[in-house]
Amino acid sequence: MALWILVFIAGCIADPGLHVAQSRNILRGDQERKSLEDETNKLEYRITNTWDSIQVIHEPVTITFKAGDGGLIMEVNSLYFDDPPAPPGEPGLPFDGLWDYEVVEAFFLNSKTKEYLEVELCPHGQHLVLLLSGGDCFAKGLDLDFKADIHWNKWNGTALIPWRYFPPGVDKMNAYAIHGSGIGRTYEALYPIPREEIEEDQGPNFHCLEYFKNFSLKWIMGENWEQPASDLWP
């Protein structure tokens, strides 16, 4: 079975076929990868910077998106930092405030309406799903089929995000990873804020929507796919 690996520089993936002929020349420093096997597509992202555009010095967190039964599969492969300790919640259930623990997050945005979905996944099995409009959360704690496993110093997790959770017309995304405690708390971003745009005393803010970059569910599902209607969005 033929397997084609097409690699894209982060932020330049607006046209899935744009860099086919040039793919051999842009393997270094890529944050996004699109793999095609017959008609099954997947997108792979690597978080290589902190929120303020400093390169991470550990193995990057990898997030993979692919088609699932009734939704989008989100796979996480990451180092396990074991800091902070596990949240005091039951694995497999939503946990409010999960962003204060070790977590990997993905945001899916409609840049015109400013409506977006936030999905947070924890190595200990807890999760948190939030629906937001203009930065205001109007629904959270939605159910999610999510399983996570820790193997020594690494963890992996798989979640199935139902289509009804996505706002109509998703065209941008970003992803984040957080770990550590106190002054060692580390905030990493797929698409960080450029160093020259950071203001004095500015801290991490994952809701800076202007730094999200192009994303389409059709890159995974196919150009003829239509997003199912949702009862959760106006």
Model-derived segments and their meaning:
Residues D30-E37, F95-V104, L109-Y116, P168-P234:
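Acidic/polar low-complexity flexible segments
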Residues F65, G70-P84, W155-P162:
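Short, well-ordered beta-strand segments enriched in hydrophobic/aromatic residues
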